[in-house]
Amino acid sequence: MSKVEESIEVGVPVHTAYNQWTQFETFPQFMSGVERIEQRTDTLTHWVTSVNGVHKEFDAEITEQIPDERVAWTTVGGEAEQAGVVTFHRLDDDHTKVMLQMDFHPDSVTEKVGDKLGFVKRQTKGDLERFKKFIEERGQETGGWRGAVI
């Protein structure tokens, strides 16, 4: 298993950052390589990704979700093996630190080489930077799910 940890400060309140992160179907607008996400149930999403010519489909189960604090997931079945958590830390009324931690298993030779060269870390950093731009330009979330999964 490989690991990646990245964080970014966003200029919105913690509830705004959290609410936007729960809108999984908007991820393709700021995550490179994510083609589509379907929210199938409150705790199950279906992902279609394509990174450097490697196409994958998989389901991710939300294993823990606490409003304004964290969203944790693990993949179930499909073509990807990963687990992670995104946490939200209030810095002040208008700023939030978003931290992403993920464990993943690179399968193909392309994925293994990309992992060794730091591609996943750079991609994650870029995704968080695009999330920052996405939410700050709007100033508000596109929606939000406030339920808890424990």
From Swiss-Prot:
<dbReference type="InterPro" id="IPR047137">
    <property type="entry name" value="ORF3"/>
</dbReference>
<dbReference type="Pfam" id="PF03364">
    <property type="entry name" value="Polyketide_cyc"/>
</dbReference>
<dbReference type="InterPro" id="IPR023393">
    <property type="entry name" value="START-like_dom_sf"/>
</dbReference>
<protein>
    <recommendedName>
        <fullName>Uncharacterized 17.2 kDa protein in melC2-rnhH intergenic region</fullName>
    </recommendedName>
</protein>
<dbReference type="InterPro" id="IPR005031">
    <property type="entry name" value="COQ10_START"/>
</dbReference>
